[in-house]
Amino acid sequence: INNDLKNIKDQHKYKDSLSHRKLGVHYSEIINNLLNKNNIKKENISAIGMHGQTVSHTKKDNQTISIQIGCPKTLSEKTNIRVVSDFRQDDIENGGEGAPLAPLFHDYVFNKLGAKRAIVNIGGISNISFLTSNNNSLYGFDSGPGNTLIDSWVKDKYNLDYDISGNIAKSHNCIDQLLKNFMMDKYFHAKFPKSTSTEYFSREWLSENLKLLKHNYNDGDVLSTLTNLTAFSIIQGIADNYKNCDEIYVCGGGAFNKTIITEMELAARKRFSKQIILDTTNSLGV
């Protein structure tokens, strides 16, 4: 399925693809196995919420275009459970970005009365949720690249799927001028609401930025810089929009990259005038 999704992105073939149905079947297998494993009766499930797999998320003529695959009808038929889907389009039609979806879930699961808390999900793209637990309005946005640039660089230069625990990046040095150049991108300075995608922060984006400085950098140092970019842009997004934040918790695949976490801690010390609790959501039991 991962290869199918990549081919869809590369070839720009979306809902007419067989993968639209295949993903629905895949989701149904996961759900059916989960219910069976935990002895949960289907009649006790009110509905399945499915937002699908995003294959394109762009802006054109100041209009957000967000396309997901994963057939809700197939999922419903294979599980015999009602499915609620296409969450993003209603938000887009009402002036929103259609992403990220995570804040509602994060607020429900991680809200703690009085806590000044932000939740960071590091997937391909990083998104931040600012919770309502301190009389705030719930909001969130994409802070920038998460794993996408790191993973693509590691794949191209080391033939690995990802930098395990951030070990390669840890053994190299961040290139300060290159990081500054990355951070000059207009997205990092745009006000929320805002969202982005791996179509924007892509191999092409990285290649163009490397060309600007006309320097033959060490592969490991570029990787270290990309890791710092993820960490720094997250902390900048929090510090610029939630100065009273006391707690930051990280989830998603990037939470396993110890170097991202370490660089986030270092960046937080520089941006905040107080001690910030920074940990993964594992410490909250999730």
Segments (PLM) and residue ranges:
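Conserved ATP-utilizing enzyme core subdomain
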Residues: 139-231, 235
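Short beta-strand-loop/turn "lid" adjacent to the catalytic site in phosphate-handling enzymes
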Residues: 11-72
